[in-house]
Amino acid sequence: MLVSPDSGANKKSNKLFDNLGVFLGLIKCDKRRNMSTGELSFFEVFADNLYGKPCLIVDDICDGGRTFIGIAEELKKKNAGDIYLFVTHGIFSYGTEELTKNFKKVFCTNSFSDIKDDLIEQFKIII
């Protein structure tokens, strides 16, 4: 199942599907953020029982990973199978330890840096 982690990604996913003229199953999610502190306080997955299906969260950037960890925890409550993360830009400013608790694998490009970590699989950008 393809997972869109927040309202911004939901819009991008819908636009992509419109441009392709297809709709691939999409699980939409949302979160609440305190705009003055930046603290995330609530995550919601708009799906029922996922019956052990694998889930791939897709977004543009992962810095600290709090959004993705919160969404992964909610997906687990909905009986998701293995959970994967794909981001174009992987910064991982807090490391990957917390991500290893929630994701089977994380995929990203080397647009930010080359990363040596068993959890991370990078795709090299060739210019």
Named regions from a protein language model:
Residues 1-127:
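PRPP-associated nucleotide enzymes
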